[in-house]
């Protein structure tokens, strides 16, 4: 069986990995073996954090809504329940945006929630 030399193919593959590791600290951006491990790990972090980002933003929106709701003497859960009873279907992202940028509109929604809870 003849000897197989992977010259250009192997070099190209390794060069691609080292290029992906550009900017990494120490030997991680120089040595193929270490760079390969670092790149693989970075892919794992990226995959995990794309999912975690959705959770993080939801937590941020809830914290902002809760802070604005408490200025109206409502807890987050009471506000959300009141909005549901009032038939106001607004998502947390929009509600958090109103709480930060347009407090008057948020207060109107909070008043609607209070009235619905009082019934």
From Swiss-Prot:
The keyword Transcription does not apply. InterPro entries: Ribosomal_bL20, RIBOSOMAL_L20_CS, Ribosomal_protein_bL20_C. One of its GO terms (biological process) is translation. Coiled coil: none annotated. NCBIfam families: rplT_bact. PANTHER family: 39S RIBOSOMAL PROTEIN L20. Belongs to the bacterial ribosomal protein bL20 family. This is Large ribosomal subunit protein bL20. The gene is rplT.
């Amino acid at each position: 069986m003849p000897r197989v030399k992977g010259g250009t193919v192997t070099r190209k593959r390794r060069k691609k990995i080292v290029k992906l590791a550009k900017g990494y600290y120490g030997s991680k951006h120089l040595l193929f073996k270490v760079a390969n491990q670092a790149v693989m790990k970075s892919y794992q972090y990226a995959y995990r954090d794309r999912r975690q980002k959705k959770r993080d933003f939801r937590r941020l929106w809830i914290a902002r809504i809760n802070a604005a709701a408490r200025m109206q003497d409502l807890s987050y859960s009471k506000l959300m329940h009141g909005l549901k009873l009032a038939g106001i279907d607004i998502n947390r992202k929009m509600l958090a945006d109103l709480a930060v940028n347009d407090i008057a509109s948020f207060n109107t929604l909070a008043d609607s929630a209070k009235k619905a809870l009082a019934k």
